[in-house]
Swiss-Prot record:
Keywords: DNA damage, DNA recombination, DNA repair, Nucleus. Coiled coil: none annotated. It comes from Candida glabrata (strain ATCC 2001 / BCRC 20586 / JCM 3761 / NBRC 0622 / NRRL Y-65 / CBS 138) (Yeast). This is DNA repair protein RAD59. The keyword Ubl conjugation does not apply. It is found in: Nucleus. Pfam families: Rad52_Rad22.
Length: 212
């Protein structure tokens, strides 16, 4: 394989009212590396993550938690900047949806419960608590086009409607971003397996410049 995708010999046709020349063809390399550069760089990213998390997974104090819950956002972002360069990757928030804490409810924010201010649970003054559940999708794209997207979730309960709303949205986006950065490992593992088994028929990479 020459490592490049080619459309030579392809024949295109269009229906009534559509000109073939008006169609823009875009290669979507979602779920696979677009160049040798991304394979190498993602490998470096994984080595940094593994070194950082070695102590986490060898400490009983943390238990069996998902890695995205244990590694801080700023650590992953720092690793990404070191490995890909500050201008070598970008994030896109594809959507953020919120709803209150009641299953089946459609309103964005509402009172989830009332908690007695009296620690004894008596008839003391009541304080409103607002619970908001958020879901967000974040896409991470490297400069060669390699990309991945993940969904994150969050639940926030505070005395303020706006605070719960903002906190839930922010945490859902952060959760999605962390999962997306961590998911690059799966892309490389699958790529290695498919390459070994001659899975690709359109070339290994989609980038015109395999080495960036």
């Amino acid at each position: 394989m020459d490592g490049k995708v080619t459309y030579e010999g392809a024949v295109y046709s269009s229906g009534p009212g559509v000109e073939v020349g008006d169609i823009v063809f875009v290669e979507d390399w979602d779920g696979r590396p677009a160049s040798e550069w991304s394979v190498q760089r993602i490998g470096v990213l994984q080595s940094k993550i593994e070194r950082y998390t070695y102590q986490i997974y060898h400490s009983n104090r943390y238990g069996k938690h998902n890695l995205s819950k244990l590694i801080p956002r700023h650590v992953l972002v720092g690793f990404a900047n070191e490995v890909f360069g500050f201008d070598g990757w970008k994030t896109d928030i594809e959507f953020v949806e919120t709803k209150d804490g009641f299953p089946g409810s459609t309103s964005s924010i509402s009172i989830a419960d009332k908690i007695s201010a009296d620690s004894g649970g008596g008839t003391g003054a009541l304080a409103d608590r607002y619970t908001v559940i958020a879901e967000a999708s974040v896409k991470v794209t490297l400069k060669d086009g390699t990309n991945t997207r993940m969904t994150g979730f969050s639940r926030a309960t505070t005395p303020s409607k706006i605070e719960s709303f903002n906190k839930a949205k922010k945490e859902a986006v952060n959760d999605a971003l962390k999962k997306a950065l961590l998911s690059f490992e799966k892309i490389i593992l699958e790529h290695e397996l498919k390459t070994k088994n001659d899975f690709y028929v359109d070339g290994l990479y989609g980038s015109k410049a395999q080495k960036i």
